[in-house]
Regions:
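Basic, helix-initiating cap at the start of DNA-binding domains
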Residues: 1-34, 38-50, 57-64
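Amphipathic, non-transmembrane alpha-helical scaffold segments
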Residues: 16, 24, 70, 74, ...
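Hydrophobic packing within well-folded, soluble alpha/beta domains
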Residues: 23, 27, 31, 44, ...
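Amphipathic alpha-helical linker/stalk segments
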Residues: 67-98, 104-106, 110
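Amphipathic alpha-helical packing segments from all-alpha helical-bundle domains
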Residues: 93, 109-113, 117, 127-153, ...
């Protein structure tokens, strides 16, 4: 058994995980290429070479599938930011490092395409904008706000409203 205490997945479970990842990859490409409204579950199923029933068994709605795409697109950078926003003896340098990493991430092609998609679709589908905020900037803002509040409490950063400071940095 691995050190994490979790049993490794069996073949069937591993296939399910692989299939889910493949669905999310195809959906991401479809959403980015065609937009949310123009992407259908039928088109995703056709590209995968499977049935809509299989697709629905993994994701009960297009919104759930889009949420999985957002989670996939943001999980790696969210972990990177969480690692950067650990308590530090040099909080100002840590804030600077976070800001540089954040701006570098936003300038990459895929995040730019994702942001454009959200902006383009949010007018017709405001729930999509809310879903994006809850999955992407929201958790990052919460991490940064808590980090800044800790720095302010320890005296390493000037006292201010940590939420306003986090908003200003992002």
């Amino acid at each position: 058994m691995p050190k994490s205490g979790k049993k490794p997945p069996g073949k069937r479970e591993a296939r399910k995980i692989d299939r889910r990842e493949a669905i999310v990859e195809v959906a991401k490409r479809q959403f980015l290429d065609n937009g949310y409204a123009a992407t259908s579950m039928s088109a995703i199923a056709a590209e995968l070479g499977g049935s809509k029933a299989t697709l629905w068994s993994y994701f009960p709605s297009k919104e759930d599938l889009f949420a999985a795409v957002l989670d996939d697109a943001t999980s790696a950078y969210r972990q990177q930011f969480a690692d950067l926003l650990r308590p530090s003896k040099d909080m100002p340098s840590a804030v600077l490092q976070f800001t540089r990493s954040f701006m570098a991430k936003l300038a990459l092609p895929e995040p730019l395409r994702l942001h454009r998609l959200i902006v383009a679709e949010s007018g017709r589908n405001p729930e999509l904008g809310q879903l994006f905020f809850e999955r992407a900037p929201g958790p990052t803002l919460a991490l940064l706000k808590d980090f800044l509040a800790d720095g302010m409490a320890s005296g390493q950063l000037r006292q201010a409203d940590p939420q306003l400071a986090a908003d200003a940095l992002t």
